[in-house]
Amino acid sequence: LYLVQTAEKGLAWMRLTAGGKPGHGSFVHDDNAVTRLCEAVARLGSTRLPTVLTPPMRQFLDAVSDAYGIEIDPDEPEEALARLGSISRMIGAALRNTANPTMLDAGYKANVIPGTASATVDGRFLYGQQEEFERQLAGLIGEGIQREWLVHDQAVETTFDGPLVDQMVAALKSEDDGARPVPFTMSGGTDAKSFERLGMRCFGFSPLRLPPDLDFASLFHGIDERVPVESLQFGIRVLDRFLRNA
């Protein structure tokens, strides 16, 4: 299976700020901004939001079921995805809205209780899920926490069809007879958000034939982020043919 991005999640990066009464760290203190913020952050980080099966991911799961003979329960798709190995972490993020705390900031000295504390959260919502995601956030963050959008941009989605898709299929099969391109939703973000506003349909086509034992998803923004040379060479050949014929 070769993944082709036909959708990507929306961006909702936010700063959460809690206020409290500043004071001396040695005193009894029941109005602590750090504590209030951490409670909200812990709720966000420990809550797995409900599964939402969008059209691209339904097509992806159908392809996985057919290719690997795996029976997939639409209500519990992650149980089947776990059998796919490391890629399940990336694909699993495309089955629900997510909100991951990434940064914390509070105080300036060990013995001073700060008046404010803030956290940065990387939020991502599925296509058609923006309002529901904001409702979910409000319930988890709770009262007494201010939310400020740092980056907020739309989710996008298109269908897996048309002349470009036909050329992707042909280019892949020229290098791999058994290639089967399948659509999926990208949990990250690309320029598709901007191009979509211009009326352009966008596909993410980065053909790589990866070694089966490579935990490729773990390399994204990780230590020694890289692509195997053989995989890159394969992709160059496929993209060259695609661009010449598209």
State where each predicted segment sits:
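Metal-dependent amide/peptide-bond hydrolase catalytic core
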Residues: 2-234, 240, 244
